[in-house]
């Protein structure tokens, strides 16, 4: 359950879940073994709701007019935020405003995630079919999104 919360926050902040189109956008997250870990559904207003594999709401994310994404738990309590600068670097903050990590995407589409100390915590890559593969700092596959 923890992996879906972490991945979901990263996916939204990195702009990997889109709200374009008339139909709600639904993404399914799977672990390295291909087991369903949950979903993220974005409505036409840009609010994303995260659910676990059993369909229970785990939290949500919404973006304001200034591009700041705020994450909330299932009870609606603020869990943190993310903002992206003009260079494409996304900074994640906890509910108290302290920096918890960053994400940067290179020209090949590989996103590198770092903790607050600048250490690499993982990467993600997107293939030609749109499947995103997530790896830990050692390069092991930890999950996918399609």
Task: Please report, for each region that a protein language model flagged, where it lies by residue.
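Bacterial N-terminal signal peptides that target proteins for export
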Residues: 1-8
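Sec/Tat signal peptide C-region and signal peptidase I cleavage site
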Residues: 5, 18-22
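Bacterial N-terminal signal peptides
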Residues: 8-15
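Short, low-complexity, intrinsically disordered N-terminal segments
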Residues: 15-18, 38
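Intrinsically disordered, low-complexity proline/glycine-rich segments
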Residues: 23-146
